[in-house]
Design a protein with these regions (language model features):
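Short tryptophan-centered beta-strand motifs in secreted/extracellular beta-sheet-rich domains
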Residues: 14, 84-86, 155-167, 171-175
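Extracellular beta-strand elements of beta-rich domains used
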Residues: 14, 209-214
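Extracellular glycan-recognition surfaces and repeat-rich motifs
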Residues: 18-57
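Secretory/extracellular carbohydrate-interaction modules
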Residues: 49-135
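Short, aromatic/His-centered strand-loop micro-motif at the edge of beta-sheets
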Residues: 135-159
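Flexible glycan-contacting loops in extracellular carbohydrate-active proteins
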Residues: 183-211
């Protein structure tokens, strides 16, 4: 079912009692069996990881336990421009992110939603990376597609912005954070995709999530 809208705005705070889980779908990472969850704090959400886990462990041997992802439950069909933003922070070095996924697969073992091809816009202490994750012969693969070198501090709130624009050459991504911007094309993205957030490689805190779509864009059920 396609619901065409004149314009679309979605905005939620992740403060306690201010958001609905029904607006989102939890998504499993394709590299691990772990299917994570969020821990609700007063003004944000953070991955639900073992309380005694060190930050270094969450970045290395406990990487899978730190991975928690969810997407806005409705798929965007873009006409011109879509803007997605989230206010986030990290406790140690990395790596809260915005995710763009053309489609969602299903885990063969459990049937829960699982990422296939997707793009990650990742904030960390040395800058921002854009990673392109693919699904080849039933296995995940990934490559760094673009990046910005910049210093970002732990325990500091940043608003990460992703602007996706439809152009004659395909979908163009412009990333902005704390006054810095960079951009790249996303070949093969297409005009339909899910938008969401992922916490990984350390404790990541998310304070809000917003999507704004231009006139003529649509939502798919």
């Amino acid at each position: 079912m396609i619901s065409v809208v004149e314009a679309f705005e979605f905005s939620t705070s992740f403060a306690r009692g201010k958001w609905s889980e029904n607006d989102f779908v939890m998504v499993k990472g394709p590299r691990w069996d772990n299917f994570g969850s969020w821990l609700q704090m007063d003004d944000h959400i953070v991955q639900n990881v073992p309380a005694n886990a060190s930050e270094k462990d969450l970045q290395t041997r406990m990487h899978s336990e730190a991975y928690v992802a969810m997407c806005f439950a409705k798929k965007i069909r873009m006409a011109k421009k879509v803007i997605c933003s989230s206010t986030m922070s990290f406790d140690y070095r990395m790596a809260p992110l915005i995710v763009i996924a053309p489609t969602l697969g299903k885990c063969e073992k459990t049937g829960v939603p699982e990422f296939r091809e997707h793009w990650e816009i990742v904030l960390y202490d040395k800058g921002i990376n854009v990673w392109h994750h693919t699904w080849e012969n039933g296995k995940p693969a990934w490559v760094k597609f673009s990046y910005l070198l910049e210093e970002y501090l732990p325990n500091t709130k940043y608003q990460l912005n992703a602007v996706i624009t439809d152009t004659p050459k395909g979908q163009m991504l412009e990333v902005g954070c704390n006054g810095k911007k960079f951009g790249c094309f996303l070949p093969g993205l297409g005009k339909e995709f899910y938008l969401g957030i992922i916490g990984c490689e350390g404790r990541n805190r998310f304070y809000d999530f917003k999507i704004s779509a231009d006139k003529g864009d649509a939502l798919t059920e």
